[in-house]
């Protein structure tokens, strides 16, 4: 049995690791936490543009159709960087709930919004 990450998983892992290393140092993180929102909208937008928000969702909803391993790659790298943006709450918890228990109408309404980041001015609203 092969437990190596796929090429796509390695690319995602490397892109998140590079983001954390180059753009998410301790002082940046402290400034984000101290801000009024407690997160960076610019970073959240970047996550959407890079496809990180859409990894676990079906292609029909704007996602990549990823699986739990794909999601764990993202969570591991974000965790290593102590990234404070609400990936877990938004994508894993809320998105996962809608994906697994939502009606077709709810999935069609909410999952593309998570993938493409257009629910509201702030992802926590």
Residue ranges of predicted features:
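Active-site catalytic microenvironments for nucleophilic, acid-base chemistry
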Residues: 77-80, 97-100, 122
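Short secondary-structure capping/junction motifs at helix and strand boundaries
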Residues: 104-111, 120
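Conserved small/polar residues in nucleotide/adenosyl-binding loops
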Residues: 118-125
């Amino acid at each position: 049995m092969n437990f190596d990450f796929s090429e796509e998983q390695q690319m995602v892992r490397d892109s998140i690791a590079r983001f954390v290393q180059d753009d998410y140092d301790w002082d940046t993180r402290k400034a984000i936490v101290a801000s009024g929102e407690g997160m960076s909208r610019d970073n959240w937008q970047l996550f959407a543009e890079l496809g990180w928000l859409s990894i676990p969702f079906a292609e029909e909803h704007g996602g990549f159709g990823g699986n739990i391993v794909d999601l764990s790659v993202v969570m591991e790298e974000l965790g290593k960087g102590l990234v404070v943006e609400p990936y877990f709450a938004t994508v894993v918890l809320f998105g996962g709930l809608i994906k697994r228990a939502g009606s077709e109408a709810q999935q069609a309404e909410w999952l593309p919004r998570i993938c493409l980041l257009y629910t509201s001015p702030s992802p926590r609203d």
